[in-house]
């Protein structure tokens, strides 16, 4: 679509905002169109993920809900992005690679569980971690060696970099990608619980990407200046559109789950956006709901191993609230509210520096 701008009547396609808008609506329409067809096919093939044996009783009714919906919304976002991005932009190509590779890891994990009807038959934790490290390196190393991405570490509400991480930045960036990917995966336990906070996080990071990629805005707002970064906003917009199409079928009561193919890709991509926009630390606030879920699991496992006591009735923490009597829809909406507030606070850091 960008290359149509060479024609005199289509010069508006040079604008990132225009192409982002097109990418959003293309992905939204694709997701809305393809998802019901996928649901019908998945039901016919009995492609549903087995429910965790210790899950709350209310989850037993979800055993026939199709999974792997992430394959559809990720595909929709990638197709829409390919129509709209510039192919000579290393940030955009790396971002698409991130989406595709993490989706493939999740898809392999999903297929193992679906085909064997066993929640433990996907990728082993060790194999999944290794695959995520390799995928992260494929996405990150081209940026590092091209010198397009600064290795300096920035913190929220402070305009100067703390220090230069140099080659250690690679390990730190991989840690951010993997942590974000697995955090979203842990959160995806209730209908729409990971989807809406994911949309909020993508929107916030998309704003940072656009501002940092614009030399005038970044200079005025004292943000890191990274030329060419704005092109990734188009992929961001496409994924938001695809997620909104998915949410139509994923909201309570869900007709389809995103599965690991969706949650690992969404989380990995959010982590990637945080890395390239230099918001690795701010991601703790941008993805606060994901952080909360992950910390609850760490506390639960750590407490049980050290003290033989549980901090929560069940982890991740959304299951704890189910156990104490909160209805699923109330938990979901309250977590959405927390995600919205945390992202508004993160956006406040743009001016408060």
From Swiss-Prot:
It is an enzyme of class 2 (transferase). It is found in: Cell inner membrane. Keywords: Cell cycle, Cell division, Cell inner membrane, Cell membrane, Cell shape, Cell wall biogenesis/degradation, Magnesium, Membrane, Metal-binding, Peptidoglycan synthesis, Transferase, Transmembrane, Transmembrane helix. Pfam families: Glycos_transf_4. One of its GO terms (cellular component) is plasma membrane. GO terms for biological process: cell division; cell wall organization; peptidoglycan biosynthetic process; regulation of cell shape. Its cofactor is Mg(2+). It catalyses: UDP-N-acetyl-alpha-D-muramoyl-L-alanyl-gamma-D-glutamyl-meso-2,6-diaminopimeloyl-D-alanyl-D-alanine + di-trans,octa-cis-undecaprenyl phosphate = di-trans,octa-cis-undecaprenyl diphospho-N-acetyl-alpha-D-muramoyl-L-alanyl-D-glutamyl-meso-2,6-diaminopimeloyl-D-alanyl-D-alanine + UMP. It is a multi-pass membrane protein. Its EC number is 2.7.8.13. Catalyzes the initial step of the lipid cycle reactions in the biosynthesis of the cell wall peptidoglycan: transfers peptidoglycan precursor phospho-MurNAc-pentapeptide from UDP-MurNAc-pentapeptide onto the lipid carrier undecaprenyl phosphate, yielding undecaprenyl-pyrophosphoryl-MurNAc-pentapeptide, known as lipid I. NCBIfam families: mraY. This is Phospho-N-acetylmuramoyl-pentapeptide-transferase. It comes from Campylobacter jejuni subsp. jejuni serotype O:2 (strain ATCC 700819 / NCTC 11168). The gene is mraY.
